[in-house]
């Protein structure tokens, strides 16, 4: 007999994979230490043994990356850079691997077009960025060295999304984004923690962008590992898109709203805390692995659970919403609001000016 809800086994599987990805399972005991050591050794081997001389291109290459598994804020940083550099007269292209997208396994260059592509093909983050930038500015290729060789002919600046671990392409400016609440991903490699790279490598960054509230202890911890200039930013909600109702509402529309929240993020707590600060009464959550999309059955299940708890709607990140496709208009589902977020660089004028001046100097030196 068919049911519109997922099986209990599938729900258990979802919860298990989320717990593993957040370092809550497999992280303890000798087995967890062994897995973490293997992960760290593999990372070190790939970097030291498989590295080759990085390829240089005529464009200025700016890398935006992190040292943890997801959830640091790379996408808002890339979008901010693309906007401010365009305002300074530069033509910018974004190079992405298209993680989790079908085209990421193909050795060909894909120009992301929101009118013809979906998240399943190009990946959620490239599709999200392409929808906010000029047409033809976001490119996906499995090998970004090859992509850069082709794209550099037509652009002043190449923004390398998630590029810190890429050693095939020479990078003129290295930016690393860290989460202010947990800058070192629990201080251990996956699965004991969320590290995907050694904190020692932070010293290689030209600038560190600290996303969100960063207490004095975490600031001292960061300074212990690197003395690179730091830019402190605050994530903020700009508006909420209710596609099924055709509405775009401001931040204050969330105050007092009873809603269920689903998201597939590397650090979901940051998003949940932001909604609480905005006045949302969260009546239930449904967490997904990073980059995973919610299924039709899961959406029906979570909508029903939210309605039973007197929820008025469902909220998700814009990145999660872009994977919904036609599910946003699925009959029998509570209204879904896609929360748009951006970084607030207020009071960081000196730090951001130093970053942009460095980019100017490097680019002018290449002419």
UniProtKB/Swiss-Prot annotation:
InterPro entries: LpxK (IPR003758), P-loop_NTPase (IPR027417). It comes from Chlamydia abortus (strain DSM 27085 / S26/3). Pathway: Glycolipid biosynthesis; lipid IV(A) biosynthesis; lipid IV(A) from (3R)-3-hydroxytetradecanoyl-[acyl-carrier-protein] and UDP-N-acetyl-alpha-D-glucosamine: step 6/6. ATP binds at residues 68-75. One of its GO terms (cellular component) is plasma membrane. It is an enzyme of class 2 (transferase). Keywords: ATP-binding, Kinase, Lipid A biosynthesis, Lipid biosynthesis, Lipid metabolism, Nucleotide-binding, Transferase. Transfers the gamma-phosphate of ATP to the 4'-position of a tetraacyldisaccharide 1-phosphate intermediate (termed DS-1-P) to form tetraacyldisaccharide 1,4'-bis-phosphate (lipid IVA). Belongs to the LpxK family. One of its GO terms (molecular function) is tetraacyldisaccharide 4'-kinase activity. It catalyses: a lipid A disaccharide + ATP = a lipid IVA + ADP + H(+). Its EC number is 2.7.1.130. Pfam families: LpxK. This is Tetraacyldisaccharide 4'-kinase. GO terms for biological process: lipid A biosynthetic process; lipopolysaccharide core region biosynthetic process.
């Amino acid at each position: 007999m068919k049911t519109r809800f997922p099986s209990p086994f599938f729900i258990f599987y979802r919860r298990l994979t989320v717990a593993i990805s957040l370092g809550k399972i497999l992280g303890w005991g000798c087995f967890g230490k062994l897995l973490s050591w293997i992960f760290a050794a593999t990372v070190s081997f790939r970097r030291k043994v498989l590295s080759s001389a990085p390829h240089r291109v005529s464009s200025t290459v700016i890398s935006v990356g992190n040292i943890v598994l997801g959830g640091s804020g790379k996408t808002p940083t890339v979008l901010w850079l693309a906007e401010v550099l365009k305002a300074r007269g530069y033509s910018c292209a974004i190079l992405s691997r298209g993680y989790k997208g079908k085209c990421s396994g193909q050795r060909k260059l894909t120009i992301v077009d929101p009118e013809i592509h979906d998240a399943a093909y190009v990946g959620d983050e490239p599709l999200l960025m392409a929808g906010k930038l000029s047409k033809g500015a976001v490119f996906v290729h499995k090998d970004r060295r090859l992509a850069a060789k082709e794209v550099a002919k037509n652009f002043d600046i190449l923004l390398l999304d998630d590029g810190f671990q890429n050693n095939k392409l020479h990078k003129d400016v290295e930016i690393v984004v860290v989460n202010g609440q947990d800058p070192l991903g629990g201080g251990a490699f996956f699965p004991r923690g969320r590290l995907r790279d050694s904190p020692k490598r932070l010293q290689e960054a030209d600038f560190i962008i600290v996303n969100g509230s960063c207490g004095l202890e975490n600031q001292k911890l960061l300074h212990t590992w690197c003395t690179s200039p730091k830019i402190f930013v605050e994530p903020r909600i700009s508006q909420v898109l209710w596609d099924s109702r055709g509405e775009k509402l401001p931040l204050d529309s969330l105050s007092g709203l009873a809603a269920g929240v689903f998201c597939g993020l590397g650090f979901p707590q940051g998003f949940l805390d932001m909604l609480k600060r905005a006045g949302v009464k969260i009546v239930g959550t449904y967490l997904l692995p990073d980059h995973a999309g919610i299924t039709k059955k899961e959406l029906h299940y979570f909508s029903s659970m939210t309605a039973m708890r007197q929820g008025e709607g469902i909220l998700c990140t814009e990145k999660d919403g872009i994977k919904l496709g036609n599910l946003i208009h699925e009959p029998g589902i509570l209204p879904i609001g896609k929360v748009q977020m951006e970084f607030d660089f207020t009071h960081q004028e000196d730090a951001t000016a130093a970053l942009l001046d460095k980019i100017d100097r490097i680019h002018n030196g290449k002419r």
